[in-house]
């Protein structure tokens, strides 16, 4: 019994240490900015600005093992026209990364690089891509993400949208925030669905609108 208690205590300490270390490591990277407009458990409605990505085609099921991750890593490591080294950021986006077998993997350019102009890629397989901002419904979850897991989370998120009277685009993206060596339980993954803009119809006589009102308050995002 004593030995079992010691083993359990050691496992608990290791888990707490790993969790704390992972949060510290994640906080070391600049992250894509957003504002939280509404929160319901692990689901949020966020407002994102336009973002500049260094991007390349990727097979979703490969989780970057098809060489797509390394293409982008080489770009930020100096394989560009200016031989400029660019800081790694979070998250790594996979646009249309749930349904489509072929997606676009993208590294977010740091704000200073985006503002001054990102260097042109040397590799023909890497492009600079403007990711359009706007409102997104987002669900957060842990584990080692794969196509099946992402599809399951997308279904949960779309059910929430239907329940709350919101309409999402057909596309669903994924986002990952952690290095490959991070244990599954401590990983931060997300599925993001762009929201359709609601059309507001104004009654010429009364001035009333048929758009639903929202009492959600904007707040700064938390990691």
Language model features with spans:
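A solvent-exposed interaction/effector surface
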Residues: 2-223
